[in-house]
Amino acid sequence: MSDDAKALNRALRGTLWPALKAHGFTFRTDRVAWRYAGDDIDVVELQAVGQHAEAVGCPPLSLSVYVAAYPRFLPREPGIPVRDGRLRPHYWDCDPFRRSLHKTLSQPWFRPFSEQRDRRLLPSLRLHREALSKLIDRTAHDRPDIWYMRDDGSNVDENLRDLTTVVL
């Protein structure tokens, strides 16, 4: 795990996770929290853009946030993680009871394929990248579903305040 990811996880421990705990989300990992009400489960999950950063046009630690519900009447699929006897579904396990959240901040800095972060591409991936870059709007724009985390970390606090407000 990179130092930047560790710093982001520390910041989450000081903002979002305590706020969610106050609302009954008592179990969590670094990027997922669960709330249990009988056999019903609520999920809040954060996903870093990661390896898709170049195509999305933002730094890899920029975040998407999903909320989901896993009601007792959904079939219990095999493969859903269990810890201490409790299901720990991810947002994608909760279909159709999931949604992506949208930020309230204006961040018109997304520029797909404006820089190549990983130069060690296989020839087939390089061709795929070139084809995608011709199809995707490469002008600067905003994305409502992704909190843009600047590489220098200067807007992490602002993003986490907005993210926490939107989640709650």
Predicted feature residues:
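Pyridoxal 5′-phosphate
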Residues: 20
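Intrinsically disordered, low-complexity regulatory regions enriched in serine/threonine/proline
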Residues: 1-15, 27, 34-168
